[in-house]
Amino acid sequence: MWLQAICIYTVFIIIGCGIPTAAEEHSLWRWTCENNRCTKIRNEPENKEPVLSLEACKMFCDDYGLLWPKPTIETNLGNFLSKINMNTIDIQITKQGKSDDLLTAAADRFKTLVSSSVPKGFSAKAAGKSVTVYLVNENPYIREFSLDMDESYELYISSTSSDKVNATIRGNSFFGVRNGLETLSQLIVYDDIRNNLLIVRDVTIKDRPVYPYRGILLDTARNFYSIDSIKRTIDAMAAVKLNTFHWHITDSQSFPLVLQKRPNLSKLGAYSPTKVYTKQDIREVVEYGLERGVRVLPEFDAPAHVGEGWQDTGLTVCFKAEPWTKFCVEPPCGQLNPTKEELYDYLEDIYVEMAEAFESTDMFHMGGDEVSERCWNSSEEIQNFMIQNRWNLDKSSFLKLWNYFQKNAQDRAYKAFGKRLPLILWTSTLTDYTHVEKFLDKDEYIIQVWTTGADPQIQGLLQKGYRLIMSNYDALYFDCGFGAWVGSGNNWCSPYIGGQKVYGNSPAVMALSYRDQILGGEVALWSEQSDPATLDGRLWPRAAAFAERMWAEPSTAWQDAEHRMLHVRERLVRMGIQAESLEPEWCYQNQGLCYG
């Protein structure tokens, strides 16, 4: 009879034993795993099979359950789901060191993530097994970012008694242990039939990322973003194990960075006195990112992309030049004048204060794209300087002028940061592989590729020995596919880039035999047409698709990940991220039936 004590199980899943609850008896729907898909079926009164909620079913109906990004070394998810009491989760740090405060913050965040798995307006039953999480950080004194930091971890979950579940996370740094906590949070799901939290038992996961650099660029100059919106972005990044927030903080349209030594830059260049970033603001974001395993990488773009804020310095040329289409790619135009010796004192002051604000940065982005020869050539002062140096006013001579600027700026950056930290530049005519070695040392510079993934420059630079970060606009520019903001029609990089293309954008395919020189990739949100109100939907969940590509470099296509992608979108929304909807919820509940 149905009311007998039974064990709820299938071939692969055992939830527990006991009398079926009223919720189980009266649930109209249940899910069952068939051919690696969770199928929605009616829960008839005579049914004696397990009454599985959708998330419980999805946790076992795939080799990777609901994990995102999927682990890279070993993933064994056991056949048990145990009810747990969220109020009895205990986290213990087993080794002491200077990263303990970071682990404590990560542990608090883990509990918040577990709480967010319960839908708003509901409260999971305070019943079930207690959970003890042991955090084993083998190098508790490491708390600094680097390109060779160890982000690997091992995660084990077992049940030691009828009322207790143990989880152990081991890592060779705080960053690895933090990643393990993120994975553990994904192994806890809400059972909306029984109103319980469930954890997967008998788990072994060994995991590490394929690429060390996995980033998001946010442009906060075209439109201003609040500190809260930046923190929200970092929260979402941490949830999918992205590790670099690239802050494009100034541009020709605005200068929101407050500097004590050069206060007029923000006074003249910010959109308003309330739309600025102080040193305290930046340090707050840097610390917030560190606790979540996300470095905050500063960019100061030069010698182009300057304008507002620089009006009284006498250090720019062609600012607001008209028609703008002759001198730059978008209004207002503006470039620094490399011939002004006082410019480099100015830059050093900027770099010094950026070094103080972004105090934990292990790299510095110097911008360096879209420099206009015509802009420089419009200045009689620059022309005279070039003639005095016996340079012609041709393309090759303007490259010499650009190199003159870059060498001086590089020296000032090294001085300001107090070390010869890696420098990053965008692809440009200066980085063209046919002459890049004349200007940029491959051991000092990393090149960030923003042209297409088929650009011959990629192979050319790799063959010269340069390390690359991939941001090819045909797959990773998230501002593409909207209406033009200058003129009519669509914007320059249309069409819209869907998550499917993002997921399939493989640096390994682009690198061929030079894969070791690919540091990773970065999606970019240039903000001509976005602001805090549209931020979440522009980035998410597409950036999650990118995150799995960067973490795992999967050999499979997006179709194999689609059901997990739909779930990670749901997780982000529960966290308070207004992620864009990908499909009708019907598709989430009816896996495999929404195909084209």
From Swiss-Prot:
Belongs to the glycosyl hydrolase 20 family. SUPFAM superfamilies: (Trans)glycosidases, beta-N-acetylhexosaminidase-like domain. This is Chitooligosaccharidolytic beta-N-acetylglucosaminidase. It comes from Bombyx mori. Keywords: Carbohydrate metabolism, Chitin degradation, Glycoprotein, Glycosidase, Hydrolase, Polysaccharide degradation, Signal. It catalyses: Hydrolysis of terminal non-reducing N-acetyl-D-hexosamine residues in N-acetyl-beta-D-hexosaminides. GO terms for cellular component: plasma membrane. It comes from the Eukaryota. Pfam families: Glyco_hydro_20, Glycohydro_20b2. Residues 1-23 form the signal peptide. One of its GO terms (molecular function) is beta-N-acetylhexosaminidase activity. InterPro entries: Beta_hexosaminidase_sua/sub (IPR025705), Glyco_hydro_20_cat (IPR015883), Glycoside_hydrolase_SF (IPR017853), Hex-like_dom2 (IPR029018), HEX_eukaryotic_N (IPR029019). Active during metamorphosis to degrade chitin.
